[in-house]
Each structure stands twice: as C-alpha cells, then as structure tokens.
Amino acid sequence: MAKAKFERNKPHCNIGTIGHVDHGKTSLTAAITKILAETGGATFTAYDQIDKAPEEKARGITISTAHVEYETKNRHYAHVDCPGHADYVKNMITGAAQMDGAILVVSAADGPMPQTREHILLARQVGVPALVVFLNKCDMVDDPELLELVELEVRELLSKYEFPGDKIPIIKGSALAALEDSDKKLGHDAILELMRNVDEYIPQPERPIDQPFLMPVEDVFSISGRGTVVTGRVERGIVKVGEEIEIVGLRATQKTTVTGVEMFRKLLDQGQAGDNIGALLRGTKREDVERGQVLAKPGSVKPHTKFKAEAYILTKEEGGRHTPFFTNYRPQFYFRTTDVTGVVHLPEGTEMVMPGDNIAMEVHLIVPIAMEEKLRFAIREGGRTVGAGVVASIIE
C-alpha cells in the first residue's frame, strides 16, 4: 500500500504514551495507528515494529525511542513510545522528544503501580502540560465496581501531583481488543473516544514563532565602522530591525537596539525562530557580550542562580561517573551554549546519588543564567557529560 502523504495544513502536536511496564503502552500505540488507518489518518504500525525502537543520542545520552505519526480530523500528531522505563526517564528529562501532552496508560487489572506514579511525577517536573488516561485491559475485569475503584485511585494519584485529577478524561478500553477486532466497544470505539479526548483536552501548543524572541549567543564579532555582531540560532519568536532587546545572563542585563539582521551574508528586515542569524547591536562593545548570554525581548526572561531541577545521572556504561556523588558536588551545568559551575544540594534524606539514578535536587550557580521552567541542561565534568536535567522551578 502506498503511504498516504500527510497534509501539513493541520496544527501539529507532540504526544507520547507513559505508564508502568506491561500496562500496554506499545499495544495502545499500535492500536491507535490501526484504528486511524481505517480513515486514512495513519499507516498501521505493528507492535513488534514499535517495540524494537532505534537508539538515539540526545545531549550525549543514548535513548531508545519509537516514533509514529498519525492524524485526526483536527490535528497531526507525532507520537513517541519507549521500550524501557529508563528510556522514559531519560526522554522526559532531556526533552529528546518534546511532549505537548501524554496518554497515561494504566492497566485496569493492576491499577496504578510504582512507575505509574513516577511517570506522573516526571510529567509534572518536566512540565508536560496535560494528560489523558487510557484505562487498558478492561476486558480482563468483570466487576464494574473494581473499574470504578481503579479510576478513583488514578484520579487521586493525578491530583497528588497537581494535575486536575477530577477533570482529566479517563477512557476505558482494551488495546488488544482493538488490535484483534474482538470487542468493538472496548476496542475500536474506545480508541476513537480516546483520540477525541486527546484532540479536545490537550491544548494546542504555541508555535515557537509566536513566543517572545530569544536567541542564545554563540559568537561575537566586531565589524569596523558597523559595530558588534552577535550570531546564533533564534530559539523562538521574531526580531525585527529597529527593535529594542535585552542581553541577559552572566552579568547585569543590558538594553540595546538591533540595527541589522543578516543571514547567509544577506541583509534581512527580521530573523525568526529556526534562523541562524547575525544581529548587529547599536552601541554595544565587543567585550559587552559573550557566548552563554541570550538576546531576548525585554522583560521576557530573567537571569537566575538558584533553581530546583529533575536530573538523570548517567551510568558508567553510558560514559558517566563510576562513583556516587554527595551534597556540595560541584560540576558544570551546560545551558544552551555554555558551562557554568554550580553546587548541588540533595533533598533531605538523600545521602548520595548513584550513577543511573534520577533525582530532584537544588542547584546554586556561581553566575546567573537566563532561565525559565522547562529549560534543559547537561551536567558535565571537564567537558564530559555525566547527566542531564530540566529546570523544575526557580528559587531566585
């Protein structure tokens, strides 16, 4: 069968399946492609194709992730599914596969399990905006009261981690029934019901171009007679010639005006998200700007030194540390384009962190960095990556 070409005129959304091992995440992913393929919105991808996910590298960390894509009436989706629990942890922390929302899969036969809890917590920490729940394997539970009990448990767990537990849609069904065409109501119909809820409940993400301008500084040049040019890739938003911007991070915030934008040696009137540009700054000296700072829309981003983070620490096999670390560990934190030294404070009751652990910790940087929640970073020792993290909340 010829692959149907995806129309790119629908809004795009990135989602993924999360939940405990063997609760049916991969089966559900396969079932979604099967049911949506009936209306031409997907190409059916079988369980074993998804299960042997290829390895990818993100921030120096190897992660196995399977990607499928499909579309509903309203949206085009890119969907990620990971084979192992460790892959989920790494994926969510590194942001290798950005999630605008997630489908939490819970087996009705088992109810919430340790990884269910951990994935909900991770989703909260890394800032996944919305979850929809698929209560799977409902064909294995005969007692409707038991189903209600499991649903209640899931809602309580979601509320505990500050998701709106009483509002989140929970769809009861069976991925296997959908794959085997055995029970239309729990299979086919439940999958369509799930996708209707994903369409409606997961908010449409704001496109990078619509967000406030930000560009990490990669290099700085002085051009005689013209001034200082700063180069980098625009992360989000648009910058127009003549606009005022701020230079944020590493030192006191400065205001300046962009007097020129060039790309591939051509002068433009603006630069936008995704463009590699050179920005000419009025009255800014070569020594006033350095790599590691950002150019940003005034007031849109502030420099900070103290934050709470969720981090994954590489194993020895992944090229990480061979030994644990303790409170007051001082590695470098690599944000966007530069390393900054910081001091780690472990939570009360956590004696040490072993390679392979993921951990919530507090970090105090020795100089401020332009930062906001959800910003990703690498943890490095002498240029070698030993971990990855995400800003969960800012302290000061």
From Swiss-Prot:
One Gene Ontology biological process: translational elongation
Region (G2): 60-64
GO CC annotations on file: cytoplasm
GO molecular function: GTP binding; GTPase activity; guanosine tetraphosphate binding; translation elongation factor activity
Record region (G3): 81-84
EC code(s) of this entry: 3.6.5.3
Catalytic activity reported: GTP + H2O = GDP + phosphate + H(+)
SUPFAM superfamilies (UniProt xref): EF-Tu/eEF-1alpha/eIF2-gamma C-terminal domain, P-loop containing nucleoside triphosphate hydrolases, Translation proteins
Segments crossing the lipid bilayer: none
Keywords: Cytoplasm, Elongation factor, GTP-binding, Hydrolase, Magnesium, Metal-binding, Nucleotide-binding, Protein biosynthesis
Localization annotation: Cytoplasm
Region (G5): 174-176
Record region (G4): 136-139
Region (G1) residue spans: 19-26
Superkingdom, taxonomy of origin: Bacteria
Binding site for GTP: 19-26, 81-85, 136-139
tr-type G domain sequence ranges: 10-206
Principal EC category: hydrolase
Quaternary structure (record): Monomer.
Function: GTP hydrolase that promotes the GTP-dependent binding of aminoacyl-tRNA to the A-site of ribosomes during protein biosynthesis.
NCBIfam families, sorted: EF-Tu, PRK00049.1, PRK12735.1, PRK12736.1, small_GTP
Family: Belongs to the TRAFAC class translation factor GTPase superfamily. Classic translation factor GTPase family. EF-Tu/EF-1A subfamily.
Protein name: Elongation factor Tu
Gene that specifies this protein: tuf
